[in-house]
């Protein structure tokens, strides 16, 4: 496969850095982190943005962005948005689609499972570490992995394909389909769809052959 060119790197950075934080941060408690991104999505010209969204057809991007835009109609800290984030990603009740890869790929369906350890080992071997205090989540949280994807495209582009093929694409579509189905608020339904379509489009562009594991959930 070809070396990542500057355009592809910039597009990957955009996708990962735009979508990743939306999975990681509570719209109310972490507003200072995500408010700019949420406000940008709330004021978006959906049709124009869809034409420019990387790795996704304009029609598919428009459908997903319209859902996200609709979900922000009552504001970036609306009760519906905040409580849906907490239902999906925080708890205390069981999460309908847990955001960690090993929950799906480990036979015991646990966090910090075998695939998490494989990712951690890959990061260690390549001298990559998540800054302390940035996240308490396992490394295979979907948001953490999207942010890491953006960082790799910017700082270590030679590792992007391997990271995608061996660690992210192995489970991302499976999880994101479940999240899209579980979402009861249009913002997160659209987020799940747009993220899945973006990663699948990136996989196609990079011509990556992924060995999918058995899913236990």
Language-model-detected regions and their locations in the chain:
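Charged, alpha-helix-forming regions
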Residues: 1-217
């Amino acid at each position: 496969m070809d070396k990542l060119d500057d355009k592809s790197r910039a597009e990957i950075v955009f996708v990962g850095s735009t979508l990743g934080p939306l999975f990681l941060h509570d719209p109310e408690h972490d507003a200072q982190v995500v408010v700019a991104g949420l406000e940008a999505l709330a004021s978006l010209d959906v049709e124009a943005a869809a034409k420019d969204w990387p790795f996704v057809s304009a029609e598919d991007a428009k459908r997903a962005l319209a859902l996200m835009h609709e979900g922000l109609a009552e504001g970036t800290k609306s009760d519906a948005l905040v409580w849906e984030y907490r239902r999906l990603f925080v708890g205390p009740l069981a999460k309908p689609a847990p955001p960690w890869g090993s929950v799906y790929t480990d036979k015991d369906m646990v966090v910090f499972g075998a695939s998490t350890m494989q990712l951690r080992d890959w990061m260690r071997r390549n001298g990559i570490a998540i800054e302390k205090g940035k996240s308490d989540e396992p490394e295979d949280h979907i948001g953490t992995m999207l942010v890491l994807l953006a960082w790799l495209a910017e700082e270590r582009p030679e590792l992007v394909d391997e990271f995608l093929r061996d660690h992210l694409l192995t489970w991302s579509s499976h999880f994101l389909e479940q999240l899209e189905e579980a979402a009861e608020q249009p913002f997160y339904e659209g987020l799940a769809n747009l993220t899945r379509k973006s990663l699948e489009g990136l996989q196609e562009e990079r011509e990556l052959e992924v060995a999918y594991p058995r899913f236990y959930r």
